[in-house]
């Protein structure tokens, strides 16, 4: 029994092709440079890969189905691109839900379109002075 339907498999096929063309050939250079070009996020956003769970009114796919996030993880692993430093899982899995669940409508209108399009790249900054995790 598959947990994925035809829509998931179409997403997988598109994402796999996009990763093969846009990420895999560049991984070594990005690792050496220690940076991924901002344009990569814009390219991913233009393909609809960054905002599946973001409401359509804010530029997303309007599909609240975590299986798409799981496909992201599978395809990054398949492409051996999980360590590319691009931060797609952080953007898609961790931070989008903060914005979709905890922002008011004005904040959603301000931030979600850019997050879905890749114009804005999300990040997390944490500190636990003197205790806790060493996030470095």
Task: Label each residue range with its predicted role.
Residues 1-7:
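Intrinsic disorder at enzyme termini
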Residues 5, 12, 34-38:
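Amphipathic, non-membrane alpha-helical segments in soluble helical-bundle scaffolds
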Residues 7-21:
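A non-catalytic, amphipathic alpha-helix used as a structural packing/dimerization or gating element
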Residues 22-136:
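Glycine-rich flavin
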